[in-house]
């Protein structure tokens, strides 16, 4: 499903881990941005006709044979171009400058000496000042292309910021998109709004209207099936579709018995009572848990759950009959093409819950969120009037509690884990911490320890608690709970949940760990 955007910033991705952050920063200004891999950048330029282009960073070196380049048409289109890190080096190499391996690498915090006034620095940095930026480079520019001048230097980069003001070409060795460059967002805003002259009129209200019109045009009078999990992505998808096509939509909520406490009741109440959406609730807990009983391999757990989900969803869809479209809550990061210096770009489109269903059932896909990041989806949810408790709900994995129960899965262990998890989240909400934490949950370890309760000896499970802060889930830090909170929560779990006699707290960040345990 495509929606049109008149003023777009095109971001050419050379494989940087923070390319998505550039797009999100631009969107936060109220300007639409789109990412394309360097291999298909020329097609993106012809299709999108952008008002400005940003060249991303990269793990590659311009000195390597076959390293990525931008289409030369980028520099011939007569539009503003901003190069960031590797993007700066690519711009210089392609326009006649020179890049060499640096004698002094710069990683982390650095200071930029502002040498000249520039439209990029207007109202942000003054000539002669020293400004904190974030660097991550080994190579550096050593000779400028014709028409360029130096506007900023650093200890390890004599051409840390350069510009050709006549052609509106700007390039920086540092990363303005990361929070560690305190004024980076203002610099990007100067480039997008002042230099490129793009109006910041992209909003969720406008996107909502465009998406509804696009859904109606694509779907017509046909029926649509939507898999509902209760998470923010599927919830926003369902409400947006219902606003567009009303009773043509049927939602299916498959309860696999591995969800959080009271989650099924909360989902049913919201969508049946508040939105009057036709919703089929399938209680398939016995089927899933029986199939998982005794399974210890985390990958087999995921595959078993995925296979059964497809079987249940397929069976329920056949009962409805006549549906031509399957709706998915696919987000923009799921469809952005990954970048490889050699070979074709690879597009990741499958969704862990319904992957393979459209082909098996001869249905067409409708993906109204495929142009949005997670924070865009939350904004759209507010625009649609979804309750905050659903919009701010912590991420929850498709396989549910099965992957928070390392070792063999049993019905008893899932119930123990569900109760412990509910207590932990209850204490987090009481302490006013829920919205400060990206994700929090309990894990039931496949370990039993000796304990003493009353006059008796116990031999019961260990419960681990996990809480992390994050912006996008790509990296995460553990949340520093105070000892009073942990002591209070541990006491409740041990006293109220039969089967647990010890509680520990996970203080691993990502990397090196992952957020989930399996």
UniProtKB/Swiss-Prot annotation:
<keyword id="KW-0436">Ligase</keyword>
<comment type="function">
    <text>Catalyzes the synthesis of GMP from XMP.</text>
</comment>
<keyword id="KW-0332">GMP biosynthesis</keyword>
<dbReference type="InterPro" id="IPR022310">
    <property type="entry name" value="NAD/GMP_synthase"/>
</dbReference>
<dbReference type="InterPro" id="IPR022955">
    <property type="entry name" value="GMP_synthase"/>
</dbReference>
<dbReference type="InterPro" id="IPR004739">
    <property type="entry name" value="GMP_synth_GATase"/>
</dbReference>
<keyword id="KW-0315">Glutamine amidotransferase</keyword>
<keyword id="KW-0658">Purine biosynthesis</keyword>
<dbReference type="InterPro" id="IPR029062">
    <property type="entry name" value="Class_I_gatase-like"/>
</dbReference>
<dbReference type="GO" id="GO:0005524">
    <property type="term" value="F:ATP binding"/>
</dbReference>
<feature type="active site" description="Nucleophile">
    <location>
        <position position="85"/>
    </location>
</feature>
<keyword id="KW-0067">ATP-binding</keyword>
<feature type="binding site">
    <location>
        <begin position="229"/>
        <end position="235"/>
    </location>
    <ligand>
        <name>ATP</name>
    </ligand>
</feature>
<dbReference type="Pfam" id="PF00958">
    <property type="entry name" value="GMP_synt_C"/>
</dbReference>
<feature type="domain" description="Glutamine amidotransferase type-1">
    <location>
        <begin position="8"/>
        <end position="201"/>
    </location>
</feature>
<dbReference type="InterPro" id="IPR001674">
    <property type="entry name" value="GMP_synth_C"/>
</dbReference>
<dbReference type="GO" id="GO:0003921">
    <property type="term" value="F:GMP synthase activity"/>
</dbReference>
<comment type="subunit">
    <text>Homodimer.</text>
</comment>
<keyword id="KW-0547">Nucleotide-binding</keyword>
<dbReference type="InterPro" id="IPR014729">
    <property type="entry name" value="Rossmann-like_a/b/a_fold"/>
</dbReference>
<dbReference type="Pfam" id="PF02540">
    <property type="entry name" value="NAD_synthase"/>
</dbReference>
<dbReference type="InterPro" id="IPR017926">
    <property type="entry name" value="GATASE"/>
</dbReference>
<dbReference type="InterPro" id="IPR025777">
    <property type="entry name" value="GMPS_ATP_PPase_dom"/>
</dbReference>
<protein>
    <recommendedName>
        <fullName>GMP synthase [glutamine-hydrolyzing]</fullName>
        <ecNumber>6.3.5.2</ecNumber>
    </recommendedName>
</protein>
<comment type="pathway">
    <text>Purine metabolism; GMP biosynthesis; GMP from XMP (L-Gln route): step 1/1.</text>
</comment>
<feature type="active site">
    <location>
        <position position="175"/>
    </location>
</feature>
<feature type="domain" description="GMPS ATP-PPase">
    <location>
        <begin position="202"/>
        <end position="393"/>
    </location>
</feature>
<feature type="active site">
    <location>
        <position position="177"/>
    </location>
</feature>
<dbReference type="Pfam" id="PF00117">
    <property type="entry name" value="GATase"/>
</dbReference>
<dbReference type="GO" id="GO:0005829">
    <property type="term" value="C:cytosol"/>
</dbReference>
